[in-house]
Amino acid sequence: MRCWNCRRPSGYREQVLKAIGGLAIALANDGKLEEAQQELDTLQKKGASFGDCDLVAAEILSLQKNYDQALALYIKVFNEVEDPQLLSHAYLSAANAALNQDDMEKAVRILKQGCQNLPEGQAVLQKVMLADLMMQQAASDKENAEEYYAEAQQLLEELVDSGYDTIATRLNLATVLQALDQYSEAEKVLKDLQEQYPSDYRFDMQMAYLLIDQLRTSGWLK
């Protein structure tokens, strides 16, 4: 009898393990924790790497709200996994676990580490999340707001320059520029959006806020 298993293509085992790990994470995210645990057990029995197993285990722990244990595993994964997609997922999940503990500073540290360690072009979502956290911190910490807004500006401009120029990214950039009193730059961003999306009222509204802010700053409106 011919052994068809012996003729499996190169990388077949890795593809199977990746599929099992992906299924386990999907089940965990869907709230099917018992089934996710079964897939994790299968992953371990088939000799998957520590990194793959730890990432799945961390996802399950996080969804069970065991954030301390989940974070400990995510941090292990940072040094165990080389696949950029899995590593990116680990950084985002770890940051979310920290936020679920109301520890924004830890989340920021994790995201900054991800931006530094992930390959160029693979840290887009980390930058998006980090920019959002910088804006939140600026809004809550008036004394250091300028510093936080400046960090957010740098991240958002990097995203736009890299091609990730979504409406949300550009609107956030306009908001940050306005907060830093860079009115002409903010106006340019909004005008570009108005020209590109003429039926979207959000840009007209933000342009109006920008004008009012300028008038107040100049003393014309009190």
Locations of the language-model features?
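Alpha-solenoid helical repeat scaffolds
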Residues: 1-222
